[in-house]
């Protein structure tokens, strides 16, 4: 039962970390990266679909993304979705290809993105601590009900804290790396 609780804590924390890493990967850094377009949804075919399901997206150079649209009827809808995304990209169209130019980031933009990164990172840390607290509360209830001993509770608490520390280190490392990337001119 204790091992299941530890595994549950680890799985939940790793899932939180995974969501965090994908969230910060979407933060624009001034370089062309396809992941910046992951959240763009296009209204076409009578519904809403992700941009990467109706086109292929690639990095042309350091400042340019290329979108090869599979159906030329979708170009207008894709242009509208890109404009509505407020990413600030300039773009040009050639037949079934859209070229997006990533604008230079100002120092203020970089500072604001670092603040956003800090907020996202802190939210993730809070989530991980809440998972730890939830598991520890469950273990304390088990100890109160005499399902586990006080020693088992202490050992489990130490092991869960180690899992928490490992995940927190990964969060801090990802934060530092992304912050460096954002502040690099």
Curated annotation (Swiss-Prot):
Principal place of residence: cytoplasm
Keyword Cytoplasm part of the UniProt annotation: yes
MF GO annotations: ribosomal large subunit binding
This protein's record includes keyword Ligase: no
One Pfam family recorded for the sequence: RRF
Protein family (similarity comment): Belongs to the RRF family.
PANTHER family: MITOCHONDRIAL RIBOSOME RECYCLING FACTOR PSEUDO 1, RIBOSOME RECYCLING FACTOR
Protein name: Ribosome-recycling factor
